[in-house]
């Protein structure tokens, strides 16, 4: 900085008006008073600056100066709220109105004391007040000092973007007092560094280099706060740095502004990073600061320069590394950005729209500052860039078009440095002593993680040279110390393995241990064998989460003993390389023995040994023992220079491009002398497939051929290249067999499975082998075009499929395109810029469901205790889904030709478990789709079986835990003597297995005890509904806010006490909320999972409504303990496992729980909730904004925000909030009596209560009836809506009493009437007239108009079209009429209610062939009847209907008897009055009743009288008669729902029609 009182002056626009100094408040005041005279000075600042005492200090100094010189001026002060939201029209207007009220005139001088927001806005006030008054900039933040205060650009923000309304208005002076920085918060300091880095990046390469090396001391200084006053910091260690960057940036900006004040071209350069950065800021403000958005914008604009072929990949990597070094974000995926913005999305279309109103643009052409090198721009102005190129850089996915066809060309491509060699070089130089210049390093995410970790461990210092092409590493000879923070390695598998061993050499430092961790996928990847080897040699390592994977806790100061170390090398050669490189630093020489068979990827082991020799340590191979190495003690000596080969794995992509397109491609720096096994790819794979290959010691050239041929190849020396080989094999003649690649199952993903699944999308058939894959090549013309290719966040998957997609005639979308940055950040630039393959950025619609698996019909593996019902329910499940059922125990007995008891008696339990595991794995592999497989109860006792089931679950398979009351299971098992006896006590077995079932299962189905056929049928119905939810066949649809939906909040401690009341309690509700936290099981604070499952089952048994599953914590007004996160997670996940329709997720749940629920929701919809019980928030507070954004970030399907009203006006504030937040469905209400109006005006899933509940779930809750009556009173319902029935005769129709009773029950102000007519045109005329007035509610259609009305309708549902009849008319959008048919549902529900699902469904009989009979056929088919018979007096009519369907047959009495049919259901579609006159029908029904021992007879005619058919059935034992009135009410309930959007109150409706 500067000595106190020392002032540096910088000229701008011909005047030395920029004054820079330290503690210069006296200078500021004296300069203003002496040289900028005025009657009124106005000091405008924000509350943060005011709270720090600066305003009072300046005020005192001004008043002293006025008094001293006898000046009769006044100083007024005005304070605004801090933050970007204050930079608005409203704030500007408020300041101007206040100034006018204070009598300010043209001579007023405004002093802007604050950051960029204050400077920009107050400058604009000065520019417009009285047509312009003088103002002075006094910046207090680093960002304002180096950027926004200089140049006279003033502005405010608008909803469409930042700084769009403003003026050029130069300040009289800019006083930069760096002492203000001593109270600058850490985040604001870092925020300001973005502008410093920006200036250096486009203008000053030397300063950029200085910034690269200064981050560590800069950050450590600004973070070291004064213990007595944490707001203050001692900046003395970086005095010179701050002085230099402030003065340097001010000079650069002043020079540019002086040359181009009005932004004609040159001044645009100051906007590097801002074109895209401002677009991000417009969306992310106020969560993400200006500098943070500019940091992301700089990286994106640099990537754009690279994509256009102007900027080198090294320069982009340097810029990103420098930005990250100052803890600024480089992408939206930055964890801090996600956390602060609550994961708010920045849609590319929105970003481009915002960029479209940038001031630099030339009409519709966007202009962006393009770098050509660090410190240089492509042009001396912003350059014109096409939208498609910007879109590509901003997009997360890419559409790959067809490569140019025609003349064959030659290309030369140099891939980035080898990741394998780069990472080894980092470890060796860090463990080595002295300086070493590393050239051609890979700049990637992986190597960046390695570099950052080595720096944190103190292993080496790094300095970039030659524009970032060379890295000077100065190693510390293996002296590593434990850092304060954990080492985060992302998904960098190589870094994790190499650093695991290196971390054992660490001495105690800031901590006495080292934590190695990574992202979610990294925490699934194996590292167990390496840890086992290190532990056996004395290292103290603990798994922090899952056994065998990161995160690891490694104790410091322990080291390695040396001597013999054994490691399994059949999974990863990196375990071996890790041990080899660190072995010289063990306490004694090391003998490394590789056990378990032939090592995988021997080439990489040889590479490590060769590189160790280059650094002075020679490894010798044992001459007698296979796979054994001797490593001496020592310290590596760093060579002066080490050149990293290009990555041979990456080189396979351009070479394969040549093979597939017929072009010629040369990779100039990889040849036969390469250290890397993948260098053999061209010879061993492409040449064998028919390509022309020329390979020298240092280069490789491939020319493709029209007809590639399949090969068999062992790719063990080059396993990473197998993915490239697969896509070439896909268009080769014959079947390619690739082996030796078992390790590829445990890379970034299971790559063998990934290639099989994704190639299938192209129509290419693959088969997985134990250590490889078979690929059936097909003709290019037979390739199918996938909707999209899933990359699994795996760089090699993405790059491989980009090649296959480039030879497709139709474009292909590839997801997660950025994953290539792991090894080749510029791959897409090569594909587009070198090979001219058309690329287009795209944002694909994301559906949150099961993990990408390629399993269209995932099999269901059932686990659970013996006696839980696995076989019985499994067979039912298979029947319901149309899958094949297998009992694993029975299959095993058949396979081994023995019984399980005999097998155990002969060979013991261990042998049985081994055979069971073998068969399980076989089924998981061969029967992964279309099966329901019941496993033995003890399968989970075998760890490998659990692993296999969990793996299957992880790729989208279903592992279903079937359970029933434990007491019933134990009771059954104690009686069962047919199976092997348990070794342990049954209760102990259950307690042991309970957790194991939970760990492997994706879902759980609880079957309650059944004591009747009806109860058994209900459980079967529950199972079918459950399976439909799990498989996505039935998915809850979030209602539209215009539908007036609600849910009943159940508050019973045990819902069984209200089981029979549930239908009446829930009348008019769209869902039931089970408050799990309110359940009381034996006065325990937390109910058991079995108790919760039993409660859910009671709800499912008694009400067919969706369930909202809620575990409300005490902090959010519930009863669940806040200090039980594990138990909370278990209960929340139980809701997901039962596939509830809706799950409440408190937005204040632990972040990892919210994240896991969001990722594993299946088809469950999420309701993200926050409740302000204390009433601390008002609806204009930022906290509600944050909660809304946090909910969208999960993302949830419904946002639920609940405030506490303190006055009636809080309801209007809530409605303003609702109106402003429409991007996600919003349930927003106020609690308390003052807030009851909000429950009326909220129309989406309003929580309601009922008079018969023990208590209301929240203060102020109302019933459905109360809410609807109020809505009616205040005009939310249209009282003039008309509902009626049409047809003739309708005088005795029960529909009016049905609907009017239901309207009244729910407090709806409607009337249902009759319109007698047989003229469809008259119905249409009346309906259209009512539609025009907005007064049509709905119409029931009966005979004779069900067919006649169809031509008059605008739309007819598919079901009604199939039947050819409409019984319901619904008003549609834009004055349309839609026809539907609810008769089918009426018929199905009536039969189901009386137990149709428990009957034998071989045959059903329909009597009559009129319009209703078509509905009957559809209904019976949907119930699962295998054969349907139809009889009619006129046989041809029955035959006409039968001909429309499979398995429907027209019968006569004679054919019925002759075929000995045994129907279990009879449906009469003959009018009740004519049935007795039909002698044939009478006889046929009599024959059917006699043919079966039991069944149901449904009379489809709506008659309340005792009909002839009823009398006929009453005399037959085992048969039950169902009145047509049940069908009437059931179809009417569906009509009611279609018209109102509200479920019908069935109990009162039915009672009105049927009586008691």
From Swiss-Prot:
Localisation per UniProt entry: Cytoplasm
Q: Where does ATP bind?
A: 864-871
Its Gene Ontology biological processes?
amino acid biosynthetic process; aromatic amino acid family biosynthetic process; chorismate biosynthetic process
For this UniProt entry, the molecular function terms from Gene Ontology, in alphabetical order, are: 3-dehydroquinate dehydratase activity; 3-dehydroquinate synthase activity; 3-phosphoshikimate 1-carboxyvinyltransferase activity; ATP binding; metal ion binding; shikimate 3-dehydrogenase (NADP+) activity; shikimate kinase activity
TM ranges: none
What does the record note about the cofactor?
Answer: Binds 2 Zn(2+) ions per subunit.
Query: Where do the catalytic residues lie?
Result: 263, 278, 819, 1171, 1200
Note the InterPro entries from the entry. Answer: 3-dehydroquinate_DH_AS (IPR018508), Aldolase_TIM (IPR013785), Aminoacid_DH-like_N_sf (IPR046346), DHQ_synth_AroB (IPR016037), DHQS/DOIS_N (IPR030960), DHQS_C (IPR056179), DHquinase_I (IPR001381), Enolpyruvate_Tfrase_dom (IPR001986)
- The UniProt annotation puts the region (3-dehydroquinate synthase) at 1-387
Query: Is Cytoplasm among this UniProt entry's keywords?
Result: yes
EC number in record:
4.2.3.4, 2.5.1.19, 2.7.1.71, 4.2.1.10
Region (3-dehydroquinase) residue spans: 1050-1266
Name the cofactor(s). Answer: Zn(2+)
Return the annotated region ranges for Shikimate dehydrogenase: 1279-1556
Region entry Shikimate kinase, spans: 858-1049
Which pathway does it take part in? Metabolic intermediate biosynthesis; chorismate biosynthesis; chorismate from D-erythrose 4-phosphate and phosphoenolpyruvate: step 2/7; Metabolic intermediate biosynthesis; chorismate biosynthesis; chorismate from D-erythrose 4-phosphate and phosphoenolpyruvate: step 3/7; Metabolic intermediate biosynthesis; chorismate biosynthesis; chorismate from D-erythrose 4-phosphate and phosphoenolpyruvate: step 4/7; Metabolic intermediate biosynthesis; chorismate biosynthesis; chorismate from D-erythrose 4-phosphate and phosphoenolpyruvate: step 5/7
| Positions bound to NAD(+) | 46-48, 84-87, 115-117, 120, 140-141, 162, 180-183, 191
Q: Which reaction does it catalyse?
A: 7-phospho-2-dehydro-3-deoxy-D-arabino-heptonate = 3-dehydroquinate + phosphate; 3-dehydroquinate = 3-dehydroshikimate + H2O; shikimate + NADP(+) = 3-dehydroshikimate + NADPH + H(+); shikimate + ATP = 3-phosphoshikimate + ADP + H(+)
Residues noted as binding 7-phospho-2-dehydro-3-deoxy-D-arabino-heptonate in the record, renumbered to the chain: 131, 147, 153, 163, 195-198, 253, 267-271, 274, 290, 359
Q: Recite the UniProt keywords alphabetically.
A: Amino-acid biosynthesis, Aromatic amino acid biosynthesis, ATP-binding, Cytoplasm, Kinase, Lyase, Metal-binding, Multifunctional enzyme, NADP, Nucleotide-binding, Oxidoreductase, Transferase, Zinc
Which coarse location class describes where this protein primarily resides?
cytoplasm
Question: Per the record, which residues fall in region EPSP synthase?
Answer: 400-837
Q: Which Pfam families match?
A: DHQ_synthase (PF01761), DHQS_C (PF24621), DHquinase_I (PF01487), EPSP_synthase (PF00275), SDH_C (PF18317), Shikimate_DH (PF01488), Shikimate_dh_N (PF08501), SKI (PF01202)
A cellular component term, taken from the record's GO annotations: cytoplasm
Fill in the subunit field for this protein: Homodimer.
| Name of this chain's protein | Pentafunctional AROM polypeptide
């Amino acid at each position: 900085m500067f000595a106190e009182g020392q002032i540096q002056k910088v000229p701008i626009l011909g005047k030395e008006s920029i004054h820079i100094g330290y503690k210069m408040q006296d200078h500021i005041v004296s300069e203003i008073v002496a040289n900028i005279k005025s009657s009124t000075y106005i000091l405008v600042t924000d509350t943060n600056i005011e709270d720090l005492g600066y305003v009072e200090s300046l005020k005192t100094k001004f008043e002293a100066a006025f008094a001293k010189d006898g000046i009769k001026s006044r100083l007024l002060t005005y304070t605004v709220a801090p933050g970007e939201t204050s930079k608005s029209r409203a704030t500007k207007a408020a300041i101007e109105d206040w100034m006018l009220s204070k009598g300010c005139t043209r001579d007023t001088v405004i002093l802007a004391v604050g950051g960029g927001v204050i400077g920009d806005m107050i400058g604009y006030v000065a520019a417009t007040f009285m047509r312009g008054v003088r103002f002075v900039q006094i910046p207090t933040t680093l960002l304002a000092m180096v950027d926004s205060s200089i140049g006279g650009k003033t502005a405010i923000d608008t909803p469409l973007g930042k700084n769009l309304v403003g003026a050029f208005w130069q300040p009289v002076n800019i006083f930069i007092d760096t002492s203000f920085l001593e109270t600058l918060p850490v985040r604001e300091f870092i925020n300001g560094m973005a502008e410093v880095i920006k200036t250096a990046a486009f203008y000053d390469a030397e300063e950029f280099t200085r910034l690269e090396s200064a981050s560590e001391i800069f950050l450590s200084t600004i973070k070291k706060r004064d213990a007595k006053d944490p707001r203050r910091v001692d900046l003395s260690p970086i005095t010179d740095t701050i002085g230099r960057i402030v003065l340097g940036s001010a000079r650069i900006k002043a020079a540019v502004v002086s040359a181009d004040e009005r932004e004609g071209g040159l001044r645009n350069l100051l906007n590097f990073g801002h074109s895209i950065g401002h677009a991000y800021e417009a969306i992310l403000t106020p969560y993400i600061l200006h500098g943070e958005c500019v940091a992301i914008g700089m990286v994106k604009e640099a990537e754009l320069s690279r994509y256009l072929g102007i900027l080198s990949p090294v320069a982009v990597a340097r810029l990103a590394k420098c930005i990250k070094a100052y803890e600024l974000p480089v992408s939206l995926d930055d964890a801090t950005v996600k956390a602060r913005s609550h994961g708010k999305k920045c849609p590319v279309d929105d970003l481009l729209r915002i960029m479209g109103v940038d001031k630099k643009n030339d009409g519709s052409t966007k202009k962006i500052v393009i770098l050509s090198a660090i410190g240089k721009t492509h042009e001396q102005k912003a350059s014109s860039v096409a939208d498609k190129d910007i879109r590509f850089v901003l997009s997360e996915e890419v559409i790959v078009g067809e490569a140019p066809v025609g003349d064959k060309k030659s290309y030369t491509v140099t891939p980035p440095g080898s990741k394998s060699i780069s990472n080894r070089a980092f470890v060796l130089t860090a463990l080595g002593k002295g300086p070493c210049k590393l050239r051609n390093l890979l700049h990637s995410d992986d190597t960046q993680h390695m570099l950052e970790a080595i720096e944190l461990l103190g292993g080496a210092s790094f300095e970039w040279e030659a524009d970032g092409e060379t890295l000077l590493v100065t190693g510390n000879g293996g002296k590593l110390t434990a850092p304060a923070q954990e080492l985060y390695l992302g998904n960098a598998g190589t870094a994790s393995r190499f650093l695991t061993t290196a971390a054992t050499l660490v001495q105690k430092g800031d901590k006495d241990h080292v934590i190695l961790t990574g992202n979610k996928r990294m925490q699934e990847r194996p590292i167990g064998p390496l840890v086992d080897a290190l532990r056996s040699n004395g290292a103290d390592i603990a798994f922090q989460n899952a056994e065998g994977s990161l995160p690891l806790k490694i104790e410091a100061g322990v080291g390695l003993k040396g001597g013999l170390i054994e490691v399994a090398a059949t999974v990863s050669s990196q375990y071996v390389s890790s041990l080899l490189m660190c072995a010289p630093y063990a306490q004694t020489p090391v003998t490394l023995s590789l056990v378990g068979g032939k090592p995988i990827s021997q080439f990489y082991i040889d590479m490590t040994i060769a590189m160790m020799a280059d650094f002075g340590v020679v490894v010798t191979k044992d001459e007698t023992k296979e796979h054994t190495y001797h490593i001496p003690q020592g310290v590596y000596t760093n060579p002066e220079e080490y050149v990293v080969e290009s990555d041979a794995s990456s080189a396979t992509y351009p070479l394969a491009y040549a093979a597939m397109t017929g072009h010629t491609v040369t990779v100039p720096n990889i040849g036969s002398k390469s250290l890397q096994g993948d260098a053999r790819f061209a010879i061993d794979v492409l040449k064998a497939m028919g390509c022309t290959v020329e390979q020298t010691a240092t280069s490789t050239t491939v020319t493709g051929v029209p007809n590639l041929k399949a090969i068999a190849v062992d790719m063990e020396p080059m396993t990473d290249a197998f993915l490239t080989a697969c896509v070439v094999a896909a268009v080769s003649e014959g079947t390619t067999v690739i082996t030796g690649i078992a390790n590829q199952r445990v890379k970034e993903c299971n790559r063998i499975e990934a290639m099989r699944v994704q190639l299938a999308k192209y129509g290419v058939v693959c088969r997985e082998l134990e250590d490889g894959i078979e690929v059936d090549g097909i003709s290019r013309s037979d390739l199918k075009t996938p909707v999209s290719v899933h990359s699994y966040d795996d760089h090699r998957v993405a790059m491989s499929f980009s090649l296959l997609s480039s030879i497709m005639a139709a474009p292909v979308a590839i997801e997660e395109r950025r994953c290539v940055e792991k090894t080749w950040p510029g791959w897409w630039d090569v594909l587009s810029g070198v090979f001219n393959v058309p690329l287009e950025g795209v944002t694909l619609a994301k559906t949150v469901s099961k993990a990408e698996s390629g399993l269209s019909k995932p099999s269901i593996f059932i686990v659970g205790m013996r006696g839980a019902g696995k076989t019985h329910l499994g067979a039912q499940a298979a029947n319901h889904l149309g899958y094949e059922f297998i009992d694993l125990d029975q299959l095993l007995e058949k396979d081994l030709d023995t019984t399980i008891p005999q097998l155990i008696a002969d060979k013991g339990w261990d042998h049985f478990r081994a055979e069971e595991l073998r068969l399980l794995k076989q089924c998981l592999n061969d029967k992964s789709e279309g099966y329901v497989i019941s496993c033995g109860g003890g399968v989970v006792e075998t760890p490998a079986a659990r692993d296999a089931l969990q793996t299957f679950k992880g790729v989208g398979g279903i592992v279903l835990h079937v359970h029933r009351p434990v007491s019933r299971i134990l009771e059954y098992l104690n009686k069962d003597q047919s199976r092997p006896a348990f070794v342990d006590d049954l209760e102990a077995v259950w307690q042991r297995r309970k957790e194991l079932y939970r760990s492997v299962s994706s879902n759980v189905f609880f079957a309650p005890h059944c004591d009747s056929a009806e109860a058994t049928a209900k459980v079967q119905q529950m199972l079918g509904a459950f399976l439909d939810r799990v498989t996505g066949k039935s998915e809850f649809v979030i209602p539209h806010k215009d539908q007036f939906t609600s849910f009943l909040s159940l508050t019973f401690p045990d819902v069984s006490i209200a089981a029979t009341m549930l239908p009446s309690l829930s009348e008019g509700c769209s869902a039931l909320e089970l408050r799990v936290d309110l359940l009381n099981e034996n006065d325990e604070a937390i109910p058991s999972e079995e108790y919760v499952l039993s409660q859910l089952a009671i709800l499912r048994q008694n009400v067919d409504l969706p369930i909202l599953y809620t575990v409300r914590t005490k902090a959010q007004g519930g009863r669940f303990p806040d200090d039980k996160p594990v138990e909370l997670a278990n209960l929340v996940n139980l809701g997901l496992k039962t596939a509830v329709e809706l799950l409440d997720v408190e937005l204040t749940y632990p972040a990892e729980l919210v994240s896991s629920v969001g990722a594993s929701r299946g088809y469950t919809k999420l309701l993200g909730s926050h409740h302000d019980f204390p009433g601390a928030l008002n609806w204009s507070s930022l906290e509600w904004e944050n909660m809304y954004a946090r909910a969208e970030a999960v993302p949830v399907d419904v946002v639920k925000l609940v405030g506490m009203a303190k006055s009636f006006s809080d309801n209007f504030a809530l409605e303003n909030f609702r109106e402003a937040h429409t991007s996600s469905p919003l349930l927003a209400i106020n609690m308390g009596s003052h807030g009851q109006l909000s429950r009326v005006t909220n129309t989406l899933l309003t929580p309601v209560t009922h008079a018969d509940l023990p208590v209301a779930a929240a203060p102020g809750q109302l019933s459905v009836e109360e809410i609807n009556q109020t809505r009616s009173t205040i005009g939310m319902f249209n009282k003039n809506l008309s509902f009626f029935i049409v047809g003739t005769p309708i005088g005795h129709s029960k529909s009016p009493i049905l609907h009017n009773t239901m309207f009244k029950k729910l407090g709806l102000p409607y009337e249902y009437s009759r319109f007698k007519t047989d003229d469809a045109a008259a119905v249409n005329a009346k309906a259209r007239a009512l539609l025009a007035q907005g007064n049509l509610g709905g119409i029931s259609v009966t005979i004779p108009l069900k067919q006649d009305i169809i031509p008059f309708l605008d739309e007819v549902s598919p079901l009604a079209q199939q039947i050819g009849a409409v019984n319901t008319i619904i008003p549609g959008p834009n004055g349309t009429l839609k026809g539907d048919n609810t008769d089918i549902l009426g018929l199905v529900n009536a039969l189901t209610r009386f137990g149709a699902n428990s009957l034998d469904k071989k045959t059903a009989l329909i009597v009559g062939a009129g319009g209703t009979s078509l509905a009957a056929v559809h209904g019976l088919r949907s119930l699962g009847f295998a054969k349907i018979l139809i009889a009619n007096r006129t046989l041809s009519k029955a035959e006409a209907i039968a001909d429309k369907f499979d398995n429907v047959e027209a019968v006569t009495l004679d054919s019925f008897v002759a075929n000995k049919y045994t129907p279990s259901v009879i449906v009469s579609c003959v009018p009740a009055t004519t049935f007795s006159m039909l002698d044939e029908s009478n006889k046929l029904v009599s024959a059917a009743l006699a043919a079966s021992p039991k069944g149901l007879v449904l009379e489809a005619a709506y008659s309340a009288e005792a009909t002839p058919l009823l009398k006929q059935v009453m005399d037959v034992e085992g048969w039950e008669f169902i009145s047509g009135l049940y069908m009437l009410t059931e179809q009417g309930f569906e009509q009611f729902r279609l018209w109102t959007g509200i479920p019908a109150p069935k109990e009162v409706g039915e009672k009105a029609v049927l009586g008691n």
